Amino acid sequence: MIKKTLVVFIMRQEIALKQLKLLSKNSKEMRLAVENWKSNFQILISTIMSARTRDEVTIPVAEKLFKKYQNSKKLAAAKISEVEKVIKPVNFYRNKSRNIIECSKQIVQNYNSNVPTDFNELIKLKGVGRKTANVFLSEIGGKALGVDTHVSYISQKLGWTKNKAPHKIEVDLKKLFAKRYWNRINPILVRFGKTHTSRREKDKILREVKKERFINKC
């Protein structure tokens, strides 16, 4: 019985990996808000600003912000009114302005101006929750898995999880995928979600991806 259960689980892992590759093939190449920055500080701040804001908006705003405040020391000393002017295009810019300034102060005061790379230390920073910490860590090469709306929706549709709570989805996906794939899941699923913005189109492709006959063509 145990052997049979193990075989079934291994098959689920293999199918899920093939599905992940299919999602990648059905996605456009695009820069995400957390990618292609010069420092861990810039990656973290852009990740904080990207919450509930389109990447196409976040990226140019972050570029403008980092031209004015290149590091944590400079942003920590910034006036909130000046930061608000710069990041106004992002959603909830007032709250985010306060958060990224306070976050920068914490980095300067508590971490010698170096962004911590430990999950438990990251979530102590203002504006950094579980998702933001995991997305940041996965971007810098850590074995982490950030669960956002794209990851939640797609993983439920494909049967990778039956849970709706992000932290439970994270646990399920970490069980289903080998550790070396954890930091690839979020960017692949986000790109797929951003490529197929129509819910009908997205669901149609996901139904095909879920079918065994389609999977076997990989």
Language-model segment annotations:
Residues 89, 160-164:
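Substrate-binding clefts and substrate-entry loops adjacent to catalytic sites
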Residues 44-49, 100, 104-106, 115-159, ...:
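Catalytic DNA-binding helix-loop module of base-excision-repair DNA glycosylases/AP lyases
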Residues 2-121, 175-184, 188-218:
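N-terminal polyanion-binding entry modules of DNA glycosylases/AP lyases
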Residues 167-177:
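Short, charged low-complexity linear motifs
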Residues 58, 144-148, 166, 182:
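Alpha-helix N-cap/helix-start motif
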